[in-house]
Amino acid sequence: METFTDVLLVTANVGSLFDNVSRMTIQSYKPQFIALHFQEVGGKDYMLNMGHAEDFFWTLESSEEMKDFDRSCIYVDNQFKVEDTFTALGSMYFIHKTLKNIQQYDFHVKNFKAVLEKNRYMGSLDRVTTVEKEKFPKNFWPDFKWSRKGFMRTRWIIHNQGLDLVNVHLFHDASNLIACNSSPSIYSANRNNALRYVINSRQTVLPFFLFGDFNFRLDTLSLVQDLSTAADVQTVKKDSSNEVQRIIYEEKDNDHQVLLRIEEKLFAYLHQAVFREDNGRALLKYDKEVAAFHDVIREEDIMFPPSYPYSEEHAKPTQYMNTRCPAWCDRILMSHTAQDLIHRVSLSWTSLSSDFSRKLRLLQINQHTGC
């Protein structure tokens, strides 16, 4: 008789959020293995907030909802003073007391070992042998400020099924004006190179799941062109240079109402409901970045609205900020073999969306021989 293990995968960019994560999800789905991938641990002011971030991780681990998870592995890269390696990534893995057959890979001795207790690792993680962590090199984007972007990898055997779980944080769009200059944008090209690097760095044929903040954006130039077909365009440049400061699109009728205003960190569209109606399905045709990886990566159907940039105000959890064009930045991607795995057990792959860009997936892994 086959044994099934319920696995919950969660990715959350916690740059401005340190509250309870998915209590109702844990209670409702009762997973046996939980993988939480966090990005921007400590937030933008990480030098001041890292202590609060650490408290958040320990509070979550000791919460009432986690009492039946008797083993865990927690990795937090909090060494912001080590600029060459700091990624601000955090990965937490919780194992339920009913799950017996689980092992983790030691990348130093190149062997799997049973997980028997709660393990916490906080620091640069350079000497921790059960995790691989890397900050993307400066030459990945020489024309832009070097930021705390990178990836963190762990490897597991769950009921004789081996798999990699990779926490990823790719580069963002620094300027809306630059993003809509070309299709694809220069930022998209940078993300493409970095993600290909992550995939090619794996030294195994095991199935893998990549989940984190990919910062994938819509094809902004194509989207803006389609949104503004019946609008007049006004370009405003800085007095001291020929540099574009803002682009304003006004409706040709309706008293020339401003339809769309774009600045470096402003994307204010009049009809914001289009990003939420029918989970933003009409915008999926502009979501093109993942298509470049279809040779090695698959993704289940997106059944939630764009995950970014939700308001950071707790009273406005479903409202988008006017800072960026909404997009599906937070994703859970998988290798072809990983998708075959979840489809082979005829599972119902649950796609959930909650506030503040958290993306959750529930899957089942069945027991069979071999990795």
List where the protein language model places each region.
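N-terminal, active-site-proximal structural segment of metallo-dependent hydrolase catalytic domains
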Residues: M1-M92, N101-I102, Y121-P142, M152, ...
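Hydrophobic, aliphatic-enriched repeat segments that assemble into extended interaction scaffolds
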Residues: Q32-E40, T87-L89, Y93-H96, T204-Q225
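Charged/polar interaction segments and conserved charged motifs
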Residues: F107, N111-N119, P142-F144, R148-I157
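Catalytic lobes of large eukaryotic enzymes
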Residues: E65-V76, T129-W141, K145, I158, ...
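Core residues of folded domains in eukaryotic genome-function proteins
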Residues: T3-V10, K30-H37, A88-G90, Q103, ...
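Active-site beta-strand termini and strand-to-loop segments that position acidic
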Residues: F94-K97, T154-H159, S335-H336
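Amphipathic alpha-helical scaffolding segments
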Residues: T25-S28, Q32-F33, G51-E61, H108-R120, ...
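Short helix-loop capping/hinge motifs at secondary-structure junctions, enriched
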Residues: L99-Q104, Q339-D340
